[in-house]
Amino acid sequence: RETLDAVALLYMATQIASGMSYLEARNYIHRDLAARNCLVGDNKLVKVADFGLARLMRDDTYTAHAGAKFPIKW
């Protein structure tokens, strides 16, 4: 296992943020962003995966029903 320094972790975090921004620009909400859903490849290239809970946002706002177990759009 490779130890990751702060620079590598920041690089990976910015890739994840960029991927989430890409989804938001296309009106999608991932709803399950977690380390287990981030695939790391060669040269620490990160891909956001597992869109099983993803939803297309049709309105400008997104709300959850009572008792929902996922966060609303932040």
Curated annotation (Swiss-Prot):
Sorted UniProt keywords: ATP-binding, Cytoplasm, Kinase, Nucleotide-binding, Transferase, Tyrosine-protein kinase
- Please report, in chain numbering, the residue ranges of the motif Kinase activation loop: 50-74
Q: Which residues form the Protein kinase domain?
A: 1-74
Q: Where is the active site?
A: D32
BP GO terms, sorted:
cell surface receptor protein tyrosine kinase signaling pathway
| Compartments it resides in | Cytoplasm
| Catalytic function, reaction form | L-tyrosyl-[protein] + ATP = O-phospho-L-tyrosyl-[protein] + ADP + H(+)
| Similarity comment text for this entry | Belongs to the protein kinase superfamily. Tyr protein kinase family. ABL subfamily.
Q: What is the protein named? A: Tyrosine-protein kinase ABL
Q: Which species is listed as the source?
A: Calliphora vicina (Blue blowfly)
